[in-house]
Structure formats: structure tokens, C-alpha cells
Amino acid sequence: MTRRALALLGVIALIVTAFPMLDGSSASRASGVFAGRVHETFQPSDGKIYILVLGSDERHGNAQRARSDAIHIVGINADTMRGGILNFPRDSWVDIPGYGSAKINEAMHRGGPQLLARTLENLTGIRLDYWVLTGFQGFEGLIRRIGNVPITLKRDIYDPGGSGARLEAGRRRLSSWKALAYVRTRKAFKDGDIARTSNQGRFLLQMLKLLNKQVEKDPSAVFKWIAAGREFTDLNIPADETFRLSVLATQVGAGRIGNVTVPVSIGSVGASSVVFISPRATALYSRFRKNASLR
């Protein structure tokens, strides 16, 4: 297997074990985690790999036809081992192929992850390789397996009527339910979902730091991540390959991955509150498309 292919699967393994998101989805397994190809064949361009990472708002029913509350493109350049997380607020007003203009989270409801992928490909000009869809049912189990997640909060986060978050500012180690509350919180922030989507990207980076730290201290810790990933996901990767990929994932330093939310302005369409993506995003897409990195 080529280094580039290994890098792709390593990143997928990392995301699936390290970034459960938001409101839940039903599945045959506890997690409600699904993954698939955007196109029939995987054809990375010059070592650049792009994965669409989604969180569903569905607690019961078909998670793949629910509205997406978390929308991120993760890019990795397998040659430079740099990357980026490009975040899209769920209320972004975009053109959905075959349906006209609507909030971006409507795309998955209309046509599943594939339609949302097409929507983002048209918007950004980036050819996506894989999609990963997560729910929250396996989230707490994953955190319990791999350990509390260290993070520094610049302010108190209090959201009793929404996510249930009651988090004090400062250096914290988030337990499973506190971590879930953190990535779900929007009502506690003035800019709502814009802050939430940025925090989701930040949480992924904190998970990567935790993985790096644990494996640096004890290389056998990678088995704990593998076990958690295999228990809580529907990604079919053989155990021996999962091991190789997880080891590779530890080589991607969080400091080499940028976390950027597309620039937007708040507005309305009819009675609906939406956000409009700024024309300034065009340069951001071009940079990400060229380098698969936001660092």
C-alpha cells in the first residue's frame, strides 16, 4: 500500500475514533458512525486527501437522511503531513444541486451525505474523497475508553437549556458528557453556530494532541484507540491494517493542522435566519484546494 493511501486511511481512522459529533443517529451499532466513498474510486491529487466529516441531528430513524449539525472538510497533504479543518456553519445559504438555494444542512436531508458532498464540491472546487458521518451515541463510550480530553476554555460556558453545558473557564479535562456538551453548545455564544462549528474543529485537534501524547508516553496506547474505534464504528478495516493506520495517525501533529471557519455574515431569507458565505471564502477555498492545508 502506498504512503498516500496509508495516510488517507490513517486520517479516517483518526477521525472516526477521535471526532464523534453532536446529536445522535440510530444504527445497528451503538455509535451511529458511518463512512463511505464520495466517488467510486479513490483518486487523490498529488497526495492531497479530503474527507467530509458530518454530524447528524437525528436521534431516531435514518441518520444519513437527517439534517447535518456539523459540517467540516478535513484535508491532509500526505507529502508535507500538514492539514486543515474547514468548518461550515449549518445555516450557510448555498446552492444544492437539483434543489436550488437552501441552508446547507438541508442537503443531507434531501440526498444523504453524497448530495452534501456534491454541494460542497460545487461550492469549493475541492474533490472530496471520503465522507464520515457520526452521531453521539458512541461518543461518551469513546471518551471513557481513551481518557478525558484536556482543553483550555477562555470563558465560562453555561447552556442549561441547550446542551446542558456548565463548564468553567481555565484548563479542564473534559469527561465524556462534558465533552459532548462542549461540541454541542451554541446558545451560550453570541455568534451561536459559528462558534460551535469552530469549537468542533478545535475539539478534534485536542483529541489529536491526546493521541500523540498517549502514544509518545506508551506506544502500546495505540491499541486502546484501535479497540475503541473498532467497537464504536462501522468502518470495515482489518485489525492489522487498523494498527498500521493508527500508528501513522500519530505522526500528524496538531500544530500542523489549521482550524478555520468560512467567513460569513448573518442575515435572513424570508422568516429564516441564515448566514451568507463571504466572497472572501473564494481565496480560502483556492488555498485549501492547492495545499490541502490551512497552516
Regions found by a protein language model. Name each.
Residues 1-295:
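Non-catalytic, solvent-exposed segments at the cell envelope interface
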